[in-house]
């Protein structure tokens, strides 16, 4: 079977997360085999993450988190039965997954937060709180992405290993607070964004001040040994880093191919990241491409969170890429779920790459298909769409909403569901190539128009 570049790849079976989750490994391989028998192009990513050099670390972390999840489930069960409802309702809640559950959700979640931090990072461990307070925010991915390069500190503040970055925010520092969005101070834009979403001004100011205070604490917080072990070796962290590597590899290969085939300068090409967050992954791609070729495309970074975009601007300046990015702070979806019209962002321009690899797992099927069609409209003939989703048959899948307590809810999908949604959006099966990360956590879909 060939990929878009005409290269043969072996239709091998996977040893996902080194096979430590036997049930997930079996289900993923069965799913992949079925899809291949139907003529779908599905490949398995390589184990290139540094964590794979420490297989015992991956196995030990998996077992450590499995024990923690079991303990948290028991704590949750006891709390529900003692505090929240009649026996009949309690039995229903007890069987409900770790997600928001109406009026009970906040009460349960608030209670569990105290135990999550201890079970994740050690009985007396509180130094991870600044990171955990960012859950649901794109800033958490700065820590995960740069896990191997973070300095690690002991209980008494001594350096156990010196890394490229001194704190858990990785490359992000306090210069982010000085950034402006469309010429306006960051704080002002953040407050206005909340007001636009129906929050009164006084509450908006209070919430923004609290968030900025939490981010400042995050930027200053050191990384402890237990915290470092988890973010280096857990399945979710591996999956995120592998997703980035896969997306960036596809992007660089495509841009180089277009430059050679169509005799175009990479400098003149256009890439869009829809729901870009801090833009770290895309900026890494730009930096690598510029280092290799001396050229880089213009990248449109589109997100609705002003703070994440301020982080993207700050990082772009550090890497001398500010002239290669366009920042657009826009609400990505209407209240009814309709995707933002890209006409206002792109005008008459066409994209060489449309990427939204960290977004689809938060979207209902209908919105997923609408976003696909909207992006395709602005993609050049021969352009590349890159998207993805967390796998429903992934290893240790209960961890994300359980012990981790991640919000909002992630819609894990089978690989087959990903193919079907893309096909229902008007994309032929032959135009889709899927890469399942070596951890088994994510599938990245590449679609050539």
Each predicted region: which residue ranges?
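A short glycine-rich, Lys/Arg-flanked "PGG" loop and its adjoining helix->strand segment in the class I
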Residues: 369-381
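Class I (Rossmann-like) S-adenosyl-L-methionine-dependent methyltransferase catalytic domain
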Residues: 4-111, 136-144, 212, 233-246, ...
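A short His-aromatic
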Residues: 361-363
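Short amphipathic alpha-helix with an adjacent loop that forms part of the alpha/beta core around
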Residues: 336-348
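Conserved class I S-adenosyl-L-methionine
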Residues: 265-277
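A conserved beta-strand element that flanks and buttresses the S-adenosyl-L-methionine
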Residues: 355
